[in-house]
From Swiss-Prot:
Its main location: cytoplasm. This is Pyruvoyl-dependent arginine decarboxylase AaxB. It comes from Chlamydia caviae (strain ATCC VR-813 / DSM 19441 / 03DC25 / GPIC) (Chlamydophila caviae). It is found in: Cytoplasm. It catalyses: L-arginine + H(+) = agmatine + CO2. InterPro entries: Pyr-dep_his/arg-deCO2ase, Pyr-dep_his/arg-deCO2ase_sand, Pyruvoyl-dep_arg_deCO2ase. The lineage of its organism: Bacteria, Pseudomonadati, Chlamydiota, Chlamydiia, Chlamydiales.
């Protein structure tokens, strides 16, 4: 029996950071630091598959903190995510990394929710920062990106933008920061029938 395309109906937001004095070439921050960031984000035992940025309307109101979902995690399962994550080396002059994910929801001409879009943000800083700087920069750049996604599609904003952010001040050689949405539950659209 055929079935249509799959779409998520439950998501969680999470974030993590990692740092290390050790790493393996060619991108040393992609090994130990990335694993530590996944561990802090509580998604270290998933096989991570990245998405682009389109959200079905069924996710509206169904994005929760990661701690509400942990009991449903399955070791070794595939986790589809929208993730803003990058690493850096202090030897390159980066001493802090901020990451964020923003969400906008759009409506049709009748005011009905049609779905949403996400945007990712990563910024490198030459000095240490604090949470206020990380949050304000994330909101500034994500707001611009989310509005662009709506304008590009000639879609009107349905509700307030949502923002999630994270940051690291790198104290060791390498650091990594990530902010992510993970998708857990799914349904299927009606199958296509071509006559």
């Amino acid at each position: 029996m055929p079935y249509g395309t799959r779409y998520p109906t439950l998501a969680f937001h999470t974030g993590g950071i990692g740092e290390s004095d050790d790493g393996m070439p060619p991108q040393p921050f992609e090994t130990f630091c990335y694993d530590s960031a996944l561990l802090q984000a509580k998604i270290e035992n998933f096989n991570i598959v990245p998405y682009t940025s389109v959200l079905p309307k069924e996710l509206f109101g169904n994005i929760v903190p990661v701690d509400q979902c942990i009991k449903f995690f399955k070791h070794g399962a595939v986790l589809e995510v929208i993730m803003a994550g990058r690493g850096a080396s202090t030897s390159d002059g980066t001493h802090a990394i901020a990451t964020g994910v923003g969400i906008c929801w759009g409506q049709d001409k009748n005011g009905e929710l049609i779905g949403g879009w996400a945007a990712e943000y990563v910024e490198f800083f030459p000095t240490w920062i604090n949470d206020e700087i990380a949050e304000s920069h994330a909101k500034m750049w994500l707001k611009k990106s989310l509005q662009h996604e709506l304008d590009l599609r000639s879609v009107v904003k349905h509700s307030e933008f949502q923002y999630f952010h994270n940051y690291i001040n790198i104290k060791q050689k390498y650091g990594f920061s990530l902010t992510a949405l993970g998708f857990l539950n799914f349904e299927n659209a009606d199958p296509a029938t071509i006559k």
